[in-house]
Amino acid sequence: MATPKQKASRGQTHSRRAKFYSAYKINVVKCPKCGEPKLPHRVCLNCGYYGDKQILEIGE
């Protein structure tokens, strides 16, 4: 099996893997309470709810 003659630098590794990581797109879902787009498994920053529970107090 081929082995590298020298250690690949961090920049080489990151630039090689950049193509792989750019293939992932960010998943966005609608908040069930207010309908605003939010990241899944996160508290909605618009209304402060996570599922049925209010986690953040949002001043209006």
Swiss-Prot record:
Domain of life (superkingdom): Bacteria
Q: InterPro entries this protein is in?
A: Ribosomal_bL32, Ribosomal_bL32_bact, Ribosomal_zn-bd
Q: Does the keyword Ribosomal protein apply?
A: yes
Cellular component aspect of the GO annotation: large ribosomal subunit
Any Pfam family the entry gives: Ribosomal_L32p
| GO process annotations (BP) | translation
Keywords on record:
Ribonucleoprotein, Ribosomal protein
Recorded GO MF terms: structural constituent of ribosome
Q: Which family does it belong to?
A: Belongs to the bacterial ribosomal protein bL32 family.
Matches recorded under HAMAP family: Ribosomal_bL32
What is the protein's given name? Large ribosomal subunit protein bL32
